A protein has these predicted regions:
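NAD(P)H-binding glycine-rich loop region in Rossmannoid oxidoreductase-like domains
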Residues: 50-89
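C-terminal substrate-binding subdomain of Rossmann-fold SDR/epimerase-dehydratase oxidoreductases
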Residues: 198-201, 206-328
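A conserved pocket-lining segment of Rossmann-fold NAD(P)-dependent short-chain dehydrogenase/reductase
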Residues: 162-175, 184-208, 212
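Short alpha-helical oligomerization interface
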Residues: 78-93, 126-134
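Glycine/proline-rich active-site loop of Rossmann-fold NAD(P)-dependent oxidoreductases
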Residues: 143, 156, 169-183, 210-211, ...
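Conserved beta-loop-beta element that borders a ligand/cofactor-binding pocket
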Residues: 113-114, 146-172
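N-terminal Rossmann NAD(P)H-binding glycine-rich loop of SDR-like oxidoreductase domains
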Residues: 3-23
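Conserved Rossmann-fold NAD(P)-dependent oxidoreductase catalytic core, especially the SDR/UDP-sugar
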Residues: 95-137
């Protein structure tokens, strides 16, 4: 199977490429950035702009992929600073990808949407098919992208599928997302021994560890289309408060100092999002099930972070954590 990834240099794409290669796919990457030094052999990299129709069309025509994983996007916090750029990248880029798929016979497009697609005031857990009235440009473009994909599916028969990701957590440092505070508790906690989060201690949103997120994309892509009743699916794994995350980090990094100082703009965005998602359709229609809870995520994440840090301020105490859990 041949797969093209847009936004391949981002937080999701960086980790998704080796997963797809391990499943036997031939992978081509499409990103405005240069190819990273860590790029696996055999992976093609195209330095292209998703907002330029001709560049997208040429890449799809040349590569002839069976599927496109459309990951390119400007995230929530960055999108509020540059809303016109967010519209161009997220909306025009999505239109270019869908039109290229139509023109050159791509079978499937996988789309990544977000909890930011939902607006404030919805009762938790937020269902899969509720009204979406987002309060950020990022959310607006993702809702529009979902609808555009539905249009191409209905009018042209494109196999359009997607997930609404919660806040994604990985060892790759994020850029421009409102849920970045979670990753920075782990990264800066190990690297510097301290971190001041830009949210309140009681802040709570749905989260997911990156290995679960990557598996969800691949499993949805490979799911039997006859079972699917939706195009877009809510998915989540855990919904801890910010201070509960801090406690999990502190248990593993003795002496770490984690504090909270709410930034009004980012807090406003965060407070407009759901605290929990109802993802029953994903469970029922393609057997979605997360594997990582807060403890499992914290153990794996700090193992990866501390392994790459040359001189971490605080060493990860894996044995102490394992012993404290007992056999439960």
């Amino acid at each position: 199977m041949k797969i093209l990834l847009t936004g391949a240099g981002g937080q999701v794409g960086t980790d998704l490429v080796p997963i797809l290669l391990a499943r036997g796919a031939k992978v081509a990457c499409f990103d405005l950035a240069k190819a990273p030094a860590s790029l696996q052999s055999g992976v093609e990299w195209r330095e292209r702009d998703v907002t330029v129709p001709g560049e997208v069309y040429d890449a799809v025509k040349e590569w002839k992929p069976d599927a496109i994983y459309h990951l390119a996007a400007i995230l929530s916090a960055s999108g509020e600073k540059k809303p016109h750029t967010a519209w161009r990248v997220n909306m025009e880029g999505t239109l270019n990808v869908l039109e290229a798929a139509r023109l050159f016979g791509v079978r499937q497009v996988l789309f990544t949407s977000t909890i930011a697609a939902f607006g404030p005031g919805l009762p938790d857990p937020v269902g899969n098919d509720v009204s979406m009235r987002p309060s950020t440009m990022y959310g607006v473009t993702k809702v529009a992208g979902e609808l555009l994909g539905e249009y191409y599916a209905t009018k042209y028969g494109l196999d359009f599928r997607g997930v609404r990701f919660p806040g994604l957590i990985s060892a790759v440092e994020p850029h421009g997302g409102t849920s970045d505070y979670v990753v920075y508790m782990y990264v800066h906690g190990a690297r510097h021994g301290a971190y001041e989060s830009f949210v309140r201690a009681d802040s709570k949103i749905p989260l997911m560890y990156m290995p679960d997120a990557l598996r969800a994309l691949v499993e949805l892509s490979e799911a039997d289309g006859k079972r699917l009743k939706h195009r877009m699916y809510n998915i989540q794994a855990l919904s801890p408060r910010a201070d509960e995350i801090a406690a999990a980090v502190a248990k593993r990094l003795p002496g770490v100092r984690l504090t909270f100082q709410s930034d009004p703009e980012r807090q406003k965005i965060l407070d407009s999002w759901p605290q929990e998602l109802d993802d029953r359709p994903a469970h029922e229609e393609w057997d979605w099930a997360p594997k990582f809870d807060l403890d499992a995520m914290s153990d794996d994440l700090l193992t990866k972070i501390c392994a790459r840090e040359p001189n971490p301020k605080i060493a990860y105490r894996a044995r102490a954590v394992s012993a404290s859990r007992g056999t439960a």
